[in-house]
């Protein structure tokens, strides 16, 4: 499994045992964490079979080309296996399929990218299903016989390069559990962080960026629809609400750059994130 992370040690500590359900070994890209992530991963290499902990050269504020970083992460893992899972720190795989069944499927379907349902948890057994979140599939598992190239992207890069063929796995067989929506204040800060990051990258570097309206569509002004889900969340649903948001690097980045670039309110959904700087 490969994972890029920054200042998410509180998640990684909980995720490592869960990730082992489907992954035998791990390669991490530590994007300039200041919360001890890199040190913790190094200290627990033997316990979790972490084969490499790479580090980004950039300052970590999304000013580097993300696809280049993901390529380096992928290449390190490809030295060890052609069967690769790529998950963010707030994601894990779950379902009825066993590790052995998944491995057999990958071995029998070389050079195939598997799209899995992206399940948006909002509580222990409640998931978000409004708009694009009702039927959403993501690229998190693939097999490779030769080294592929990522499509170039400054930000929001594909997680895995396309090997030429693809397939779809459906829940409850296998799915991606996504924790992003568990805590609404955390959601607002994360999405507003991307708005500010895009603003800075476009103003400073001329990058093509995602328009703010795309984040508004994702947040949907917090007017969400829910359904019950058969698989209980394997993480404490309050994990985000227990963190100090104002001490997060995303919140600090927002405040610093609003002042530095005189950024207008990009619509913070009335959550007073933009506020007084």
Name what the model sees in each region.
Residues 2, 38-86:
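Active-site-proximal specificity loops/subdomain of glycosyltransferases
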Residues 7-22:
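Short, well-formed alpha-helical segments that are part of the catalytic scaffolds
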Residues 24-35, 53-56, 89:
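Short beta-strand/loop segment that forms part of the nucleotide-sugar
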Residues 63-74, 82, 92-277:
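Catalytic-site signature of metal-activated, phosphate-bearing donor transferases
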């Amino acid at each position: 499994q490969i994972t890029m992370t920054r200042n998410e040690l509180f998640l990684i500590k909980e995720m490592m045992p869960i990730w082992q359900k489907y992954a035998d070994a791990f390669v991490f890209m530590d994007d300039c964490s200041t919360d001890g992530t890199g040190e913790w991963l190094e200290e627990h290499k033997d316990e979790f079979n972490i084969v490499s902990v790479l580090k980004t050269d950039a300052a970590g504020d999304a000013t580097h080309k993300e696809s280049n970083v993901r390529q380096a992460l992928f290449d390190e893992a490809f030295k060890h296996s052609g069967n690769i899972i790529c998950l963010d720190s707030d994601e894990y795989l779950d379902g009825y399929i066993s590790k052995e069944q998944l491995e057999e499927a990958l071995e029998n379907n070389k050079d195939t990218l598997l799209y899995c349902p992206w399940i948006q948890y909002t509580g222990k057994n409640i998931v978000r299903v409004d708009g694009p979140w009702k039927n959403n599939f993501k690229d998190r598992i693939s097999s490779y016989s030769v080294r592929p190239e990522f499509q170039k992207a400054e930000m929001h890069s594909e997680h895995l390069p396309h090997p030429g063929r693809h397939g779809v796995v459906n829940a409850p067989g296998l799915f991606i559990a996504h924790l992003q929506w568990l805590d609404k204040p955390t959601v607002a800060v994360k999405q507003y962080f991307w708005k500010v990051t895009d603003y800075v990258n476009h103003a400073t570097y001329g990058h093509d960026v995602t328009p703010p309206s795309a984040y508004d569509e994702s947040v949907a002004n917090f007017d969400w629809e829910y359904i019950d889900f058969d698989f209980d969340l394997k993480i404490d649903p309050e994990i985000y609400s227990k963190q100090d948001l104002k001490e997060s690097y995303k919140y600090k980045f927002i405040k610093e750059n609003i002042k530095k670039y005189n950024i207008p309110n990009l619509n913070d959904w009335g959550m007073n994130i933009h506020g007084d700087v």
